[in-house]
């Protein structure tokens, strides 16, 4: 079995689904944003504000290469922009959690939105969301309809890997 890699826009449910998949499949769960945050000693928002997005993307790219060297399969929850890296291919079986922008914003309360620097301006966030759709689809081994909630997404992933 390869790594199971969850991609999609911020707030699509990647972190929650990763935890459920890890439990169901008895696999360790890794979260790329959390790993970067712990290593740098700053939250993702603080990294963006203090070090800039370019540095954050460099940390992401390096982490992808590092994760490729792991010998055992993991469930990997990724940041929303990870699809901008060419080295994502080959990391594992990739599941795109597809959701519409309106549902995504409804799911995220104000506190959650404040943690996500790219959601500061909803007009710009929607433009980014639309721009990334093609990248998510291009990088996906499978597309998961994430509008139906966590249990529905879990069932879809488990069916694809059965």
Swiss-Prot record:
Which ranges form a coiled coil?
none
CC terms in the record's Gene Ontology section: cytosol
**What would be an example GO MF term here?**
ATP binding
Show the catalytic activity.
Answer: shikimate + ATP = 3-phosphoshikimate + ADP + H(+)
What are the names of the required cofactors? Mg(2+)
In the record, biological process GO terms are: amino acid biosynthetic process; aromatic amino acid family biosynthetic process; chorismate biosynthetic process
What subcellular compartments does it reside in? Cytoplasm
Name the domain of life: Bacteria
Subunit structure comment from the entry: Monomer.
Q: What is this protein called?
A: Shikimate kinase
Which lineage ranks, top first, belong to the organism behind this chain? Bacteria, Pseudomonadati, Campylobacterota, Epsilonproteobacteria, Campylobacterales
């Amino acid at each position: 079995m390869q790594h199971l890699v969850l991609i999609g826009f911020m707030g699509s449910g990647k972190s929650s689904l990763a935890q459920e998949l890890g439990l169901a499949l008895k696999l360790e769960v890794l979260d790329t944003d959390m790993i970067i945050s712990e290593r740098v000693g700053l939250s993702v928002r603080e990294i963006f504000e203090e070090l800039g997005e370019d540095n954050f993307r460099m940390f992401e790219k390096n982490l992808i290469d590092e994760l490729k060297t792991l010998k055992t399969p993991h469930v990997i929850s990724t940041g929303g922009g990870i699809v901008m890296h060419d080295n994502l291919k080959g990391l594992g079986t990739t599941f795109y959690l597809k959701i519409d922008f309106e549902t995504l914003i409804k799911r995220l309360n104000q506190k959650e939105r404040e943690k996500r620097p790219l959601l500061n301006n909803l007009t710009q966030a929607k433009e980014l969301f639309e721009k990334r759709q093609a990248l998510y689809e291009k990088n996906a081994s499978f597309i998961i309809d994430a509008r139906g909630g966590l249990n529905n997404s879990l069932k879809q992933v488990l069916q694809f890997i059965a």
